[in-house]
Amino acid sequence: GHAAAVGKKEGEGPLGERFDYVAKNDRMGQRSWELAESELQKTAIRLALRKATLPERSLDLILAGDLLNQCIGSFLASMHANVPYLGQYGACSTMAQGLALGGCLVESGAADRLLAAASSHFCSAERQYRFPLAYGGQRTPTAQWTATAAGAAVLGSEPVPNSAEPCDVRVTH
């Protein structure tokens, strides 16, 4: 199973109807942007497991990451699962990194079933990498916009119900 949970702005875009969950607001009922990002990732994890018809306890490992210091959003999203967690940080490549590493772990027999997840939040990314929103600086029309989104996918040695086709990772020169 796999799932994507997104913020309100992303849900209003051209892919809006393809997401599994669209938040009503970017705070998601939390007191900080970081906690909102964690809640978004937790939602994606739960939806991916539900689509795979698997309980959290069936996982050997969670590989997850985000753009926050010490991957705190992913840690908080994963700690409720009572499953070992390995934080990933690859910035924009975090999800691909988790899927590739997860595939290696499953293929080698080091794990039977695991979950890879990643998230980002526009407001926490602005605070950490650009200009805090409280600063009040005006954005140019061409300024980058970090997505408020999370994705999760279950990987396993046996076919996972409701899963996508297998994929290959290739190195090109």
What label would you give each PLM region?
Residues 54-55, 77-80, 94, 106-109, ...:
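Solvent-exposed alpha-helices and their adjacent loops that cap or buttress functional pockets
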Residues 1-63, 67-74, 80:
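Conserved active-site "lid/cap" helical segment
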Residues 112-146:
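Flexible, glycine-rich active-site loops centered on histidine and acidic residues
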Residues 89-116, 155:
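Active-site-proximal alpha-helical scaffold in enzymes
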Residues 36-37, 84-96, 143-145:
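Active-site nucleophile and cofactor-binding loops and adjacent substrate-binding regions
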